[in-house]
UniProtKB/Swiss-Prot annotation:
Protein name per the record: Large ribosomal subunit protein bL12c
Compartment(s) of residence: Plastid, Chloroplast
A GO term from the CC aspect: ribosome
Superkingdom of the source species: Eukaryota
Length: 135
């Protein structure tokens, strides 16, 4: 910044400092109108969170989740055989392990998998009749 610009800014600062609070309020309102800036934008750009912006931040954090766990909640008796087959293919386990797996529910089928894989596994289990949740 050139020396002349620095002097002009210092003069502007001194002029603003000499204003009363009421004059500063009027000045900032006019400045916001002139520049098309709202006070909401000022607060969020400074990192001051209002209730609505903090809520939006929480929603974004939830949306950013990248790893999911598949929890097998319930298997109806009429769907046991089909669910056992799906569990065997998903977990690469034997018949005995898959059968024991569905007897002690709820149980985690897969942990830390991508959203796409989680949705695929969930769809397979639900198609076979199981009740599944994603976490």
């Amino acid at each position: 910044m050139e020396e002349k610009e620095q002097v002009d800014l210092n003069q502007l600062l001194n002029a603003i400092k000499s204003l009363t609070l009421q004059e500063i309020k009027i000045f900032t309102d006019k400045l916001q109108d002139e520049l098309g800036i709202s006070s909401d934008n000022l607060y969020s750009s400074r990192g001051i969170l209002t209730e609505s912006t903090s809520h939006n931040k929480e929603v974004e954090e939830i949306d950013e989740k990248t790893e999911f766990d598949i929890i097998l909640e319930e298997v109806p008796s009429s769907s046991r055989i089909t669910v056992i087959k799906v569990i065997r293919s998903i977990t690469n386990s034997g018949l005995k392990e898959a059968k024991e797996f569905i007897e002690a529910l709820p149980k985690t089928v897969k942990e830390g998998i991508s959203k796409e894989e989680a949705e695929s596994v969930k769809a397979q289990l639900e198609e076979s009749g199981a009740k599944v949740t994603l976490r």
